[in-house]
Design a protein with these regions (language model features):
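N-terminal small/polar loop signature for handling phosphorylated ligands or for N-terminal nucleophile
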Residues: 1-20, 29, 132-143
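Active-site segments that bind and position negatively charged phosphate/pyrophosphate groups
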Residues: 104, 108-231
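Short glycine-rich anion-binding loops that position phosphate/pyrophosphate groups of nucleotides
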Residues: 2-5, 43-45, 250
Length: 288
């Protein structure tokens, strides 16, 4: 399956050896002993085939949380399994892949040249293959690049020695829990608000991202950042995805609920650990 199936299987593998409600494992965030599992990937996005994480939704309480356990023993990646995917699922998978990289890249400048270049390589690849993948999902070479990009985006390869963000993902998880939006679709909306609100904090990386990925080199720093954020949003638009909450009929009621959930849990995300309930509200308001 894809991320949802694999992640659910990871919870089953942990729950089989747990004496209690498997939801306890999710709330703890860490599994103990697990039954070994293998995966055959049929939807590329989450990297679950080569990482130890899993994200689980509980529909009756509208909650969505991550936990960590063992890696799959092995995974089979055959691009031909992607041939039957609807174009929207491909678009959401590409968005998820892209934002996975940004969560590890768009943080603190000057930490690792190698991590930056690896991350930029995946970003460039996704930008280049996205139109081809959406035009012809049966193009073996293109779907191979897509499948491997999604795996490498979240298999711990590009995070070595660098700070990470994940605020966009945590806010996106709440949107999925509350509105059943596909995960990648939530990221295509929230990432733009994150970059707008935290532009000063992310200034150095935004300038680097704009130059190296979007070719933005002219104008003042502020103008370059504006154009970079605009290019970022335009990319998700090119996938056919919404980039504003209002396009999905989401407004103040949801923003207030997400702010409340962040505050109630005491959650703080971002490379500076400054995305709390109030900051999550600002980010969401910037997505309206």
């Amino acid at each position: 399956g894809g991320g949802s199936v694999i992640d659910g299987t990871k919870l089953i593998a942990a729950g089989l050896l747990y004496d209690g409600d498997a939801w306890d494992i999710v709330l703890k965030g860490q599994a103990g002993k697990t039954v070994p599992l293998a995966t055959v990937l049929t939807m590329s996005a989450t990297g679950s085939e080569m990482n130890s994480g899993a994200v689980i939704s509980r529909y009756e309480t509208k909650e969505k949380y991550a936990f960590y356990g063992d890696y799959p023993v092995f995974s089979i990646l055959d691009p031909e399994t992607l041939y039957s995917l609807p174009k929207r699922q491909i678009a959401c998978g590409l968005a998820d892949t892209f934002v996975h990289v940004l969560e590890q890249y768009m943080t603190t400048p000057g930490q690792s040249r190698l991590m930056d270049r690896w991350a930029e390589g995946i970003l460039h690849t996704v930008v280049e293959i996205a139109p081809k993948a959406l035009a012809d999902e049966r193009d073996y070479d293109t779907m191979s690049e897509y499948m491997l990009s999604a795996t490498l985006a979240l298999n711990d390869m590009i995070r070595m020695g660098v700070t990470q963000d994940w605020a966009t993902h945590m806010i996106g998880h709440e949107l999925t829990a509350l509105h059943s939006l596909t995960h990648g679709a939530t990221l295509a909306i929230v990432i733009n608000g994150t970059l707008r609100v935290l532009r000063e904090q992310k200034r150095g990386k935004l300038l680097q991202y704009g130059e190296r990925i979007w070719g933005v080199t002219e104008g003042s720093d502020e103008e370059r950042i504006d154009r970079t954020i605009a290019a970022n949003e335009a990319f998700f638009r090119s996938l056919g995805l919404s980039t504003r909450l209002s396009e999905e009929g989401i407004g103040e009621q949801t923003i207030a609920e997400i702010e409340h959930r962040f505050n109630a849990a005491g959650d703080r995300f971002g490379e500076a650990q400054n995305v709390d309930g109030a900051m999550a509200r600002r980010i969401l308001e910037a997505c309206l």
